[in-house]
Regions:
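Extracytoplasmic/periplasmic substrate-recognition and gating elements
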Residues: 248, 285-359
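Short, polar/charged alpha-helical segment
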Residues: 43-65
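Hinge/lid segment of periplasmic solute-binding proteins
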Residues: 100-155, 184, 287, 291-300
């Protein structure tokens, strides 16, 4: 009997201890927690995610003793570098934040063992609310390390105000921008119409090549290497190179939105999230300004019967803390941010797509929930692409980030050099068509050489 009582008492004590431990590991006003975050959404002074974080801090965060502190709003590449410096213990490196937004490539930088497994906190029911493909692609060896919070795709942006004047003079139309063949022909005509101004900027040549080769049934990447020797690559390189060498495409570094502002370009391909930075007016060299209408169109196609586009979007990572309070706080914040109402408010303020199925259905059922009217054409373009296009996620492989960056820089470098040679040789009296054809070939040879180094 005494033994039985002892066992019962021991069980009660253990249960009480477990209960106390569980309570102490949950955030609350009596157990306040501060989480630091680095993210990429906007800027320090103009950020849709900062607005969402402020709302969280003043509501659910306050109720649970949680404060999310935004330490840095910067680019994904800057976050990659800062995380690498922190993970490697480099002198002067900032401490790794409790939360950060990034692309899947950071897992190899930070290390899986240092990241929180969201599966340990979200229930199966909670995860089932996410769009299936968004959640299924973010597992790493069956471990959910990256939680999707916003997704983007790509679109074609156009300064319609200036384009309309160009159209009236030349007969080109917006319908010509449905395909890359039409886009490139339009770009060359614009270069002539303006006596030497670029028509557009391509914000990601890696995406252009990936979708272009997919459209022809080929693969841009195989065994972690770019397939620049594939004959299909020449199909997509030739019209791009011809237009860039002629002068229709801006090949300088920097953001397209900045060049829109000064009318250096009037169009670009880029993320749907770029709408956050599109200017409402432009300024001319004589310092006069003009209000403009900007629109977004579906991503141009390569072939008539195959439509494809990249969809992407980083996710929310959490550092796996020894302090369980921080892990629980990270879950509470992540759950709040991905709930339908809060996620819709955040993403539609930034040109992104929500990550839950019910939120996506709500968005495309009624665009009026998007407060900024200038964003409506972005979501209309996305709606068309959801209906007609195949969406592709970029492949993950070791060194993918570096390969993508190198390809981007190499493409711009070889085409810029070729453009300068074209202008010089044509001005010296050489036949433009002969020079152009030669430079298309030599630029590809140089690109292959740089890519193999």
């Amino acid at each position: 009997m005494k033994r039985t009582v002892a066992i019962i008492m021991t069980s009660v004590i253990l249960l009480m201890c477990f209960s106390c431990c569980t309570q102490s590991e949950m955030p609350g006003p009596e157990n306040p927690v501060t989480l630091t975050i680095w993210h990429v959404y906007g800027s320090q002074t103009k950020s849709p995610l900062n607005i969402a974080i402020n709302e969280f801090n003043s509501t659910v965060g306050k109720e649970n003793g949680i404060t999310v502190n935004v330490v840095s709003v910067t680019s994904s590449s800057a976050i990659d570098k800062a995380l690498a410096a922190s993970a490697n213990g480099e002198p002067g490196a900032e401490a790794m934040p409790d939360l950060f937004t990034a692309y899947p490539r950071v897992v190899e930088i930070v290390g899986k063992e240092n990241l929180l497994n969201w599966d340990d906190y979200f229930t199966e029911k909670e995860l089932s609310a996410f769009q299936t493909e968004f959640i299924s692609e973010v597992y790493f060896d069956n471990v959910l390390l990256m939680l999707p919070i916003a997704k983007s795709t790509e679109a074609f942006y156009l300064n319609k105000t200036i384009f309309d004047r160009f159209s009236n003079d030349t007969g080109v139309s917006i319908d010509d921008l449905n395909t890359f063949a039409g886009v490139f022909e339009t770009a060359r005509k614009y270069y002539d119409w303006t006596d030497g101004q670029n028509f557009m900027q391509i914000n990601d040549y890696y995406h252009y090549a990936y979708i272009g080769m997919k459209s022809y049934g080929a693969e841009f990447v195989r065994n972690s290497r770019l397939r620049l020797d594939d004959e299909v690559f020449m199909k997509i390189w030739k019209p791009l190179a011809e237009t860039a060498i002629y002068g229709g495409i801006c090949l300088d570094d920097g953001y397209a939105a900045s060049r829109w502002k000064t009318v250096e370009v009037i169009a670009n391909t880029g993320s749907t999230a770029d709408v956050l930075y599109q200017p409402a007016e432009v300024i001319y060299p004589d310092n006069t300004t003009e209000d403009i209408t900007a629109i977004a169109l579906p991503y141009p196609t390569f072939v008539d019967d195959t439509f494809g586009v990249i969809y992407r979007g980083g996710g929310l990572f959490a550092r796996n803390s020894e302090d369980e309070l921080k892990n629980q706080a990270a879950y509470i914040f992540a759950k709040w941010l991905t709930e339908k109402e809060h996620n819709l408010d955040f993403v539609t303020d930034a040109g992104y797509l929500p990550v839950r199925t019910d939120a996506i259905e709500t968005l495309f059922a009624d665009f009026s929930i998007v407060e900024k009217e200038s964003y409506h054409s972005v979501y209309q373009a996305v709606e068309t692409m959801i209906s007609d296009y195949t969406f592709y996620a970029l492949p993950l492989y070791e060194g993918a980030s570096e390969t993508q960056l190198d390809f981007e820089q190499n493409v711009k470098a070889v085409l810029k050099t070729a453009h300068n040679q074209y202008i010089k040789r044509v001005n010296q009296g050489e036949d433009p068509e002969t020079v152009l054809n030669e430079l298309v070939e030599t630029s590809l040879t140089e690109l292959k050489k740089l890519s193999s180094e």
